[in-house]
């Protein structure tokens, strides 16, 4: 999708079943569902600007059962992008379903998937208490990125470039962040796991899986209103159908008008 001076593409890894064990198992139509699990989709995004090649989160990578970073790299290759071409990886947080693709195992060692990229994350996420498999995954990822000098930490709200704005949200994790990408008077809004699906635009709830459910709900309400008022393009990382859309007012509330990316 062309949007202002940006070219935007979803890089879907597909659908997965996941249970309380936090194990992501790829799911195909016709597969028997695993008892006690939910369906979830995972989709990083590629954004090409006049001066940058950006990734918004990196998917599961090796943290999906039987998978590696091939799905992500194949998705990039489909759009003519090599791993060496990526200039920045913008991370909403470091749960392994968002940051797993940051590294790949090479000769039994975690190695950055994108050798020329800066990996940008809120500083607080390096020590945020996850309390599950994401702790070990986070530490492995951070160690590899820091060793290669590719880890860039930010604090609070600010701008990386004239195009890239970051804002601390908390909510889903203690130091979760969102990104606003600006081009030719337009804005792309990537809410990470604070606004991961279009269904969360139209429903009010506090999720038990959030670090602070009330904060996440407050941010969802604010971001949906912001996107509707500003005409922003919203990207939905965990949606099973609508990966991007414009939010507008409808009778009785808000609605999402899907667009293809």
Language model region names:
Residues 30-36, 107-108, 166-167:
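Short, P/G- and charge-enriched loop/turn segments at secondary-structure junctions
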Residues 185-187, 191-261:
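Cap/insert and terminal regions of metallo-dependent hydrolase folds
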Residues 13-15, 58-61, 94, 124-125, ...:
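Active-site metal-binding loops of divalent metal-dependent hydrolases
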Residues 2-8, 12-79, 178-192:
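Conserved beta-strand hairpin/beta-sheet module of binuclear metal-dependent hydrolase folds
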Residues 89-99, 169-176, 235-241:
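Histidine-centered catalytic micro-motifs
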Residues 54-56, 90, 119, 188-190, ...:
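Residue-level marker for buried hydrophobic side chains located in beta-strands
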Residues 77-78, 85, 104, 113-168, ...:
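Metallo-beta-lactamase
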Residues 68-120:
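Active-site metal-binding motif and surrounding structural segment of the metallo-beta-lactamase
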């Amino acid at each position: 999708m062309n949007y202002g001076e940006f070219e935007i593409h979803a890089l879907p890894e597909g659908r997965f079943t996941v249970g309380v064990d936090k194990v992501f198992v790829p799911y195909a139509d016709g597969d028997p569902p695993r008892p006690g699990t939910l369906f979830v989709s995972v989709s990083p995004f590629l954004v090409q600007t006049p001066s940058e090649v950006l990734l918004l989160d990196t998917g599961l990578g090796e943290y999906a059962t039987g998978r590696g970073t091939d799905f992500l790299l194949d998705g990039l290759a489909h759009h003519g992008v090599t791993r060496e071409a990526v200039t920045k990886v913008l991370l909403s947080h470091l749960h392994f379903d968002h940051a797993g693709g940051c590294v790949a195992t090479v000769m039994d060692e975690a190695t950055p998937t994108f050798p020329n990229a800066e990996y940008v994350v809120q500083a607080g996420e390096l020590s945020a208490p996850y309390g599950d498999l994401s702790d070990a995954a986070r530490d492995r990822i951070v160690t590899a990125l820091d060793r290669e000098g590719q880890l860039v930490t930010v604090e609070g709200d600010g701008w990386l470039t004239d195009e890239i704005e970051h804002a601390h949200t908390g909510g889903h994790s203690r130091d979760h962040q969102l990104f606003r990408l600006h081009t030719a008077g337009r804005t792309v809004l990537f809410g990470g796991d604070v606004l991961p699906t279009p269904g969360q635009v139209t429903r009010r709830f506090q999720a038990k899986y959030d670090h602070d459910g009330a904060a996440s709900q407050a941010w969802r309400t604010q971001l949906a209103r912001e996107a509707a008022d500003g005409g922003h393009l919203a990207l939905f990382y965990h949606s099973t159908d609508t990966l991007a859309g414009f939010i507008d007012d409808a009778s009785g509330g808000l609605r999402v008008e899907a667009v293809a990316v």
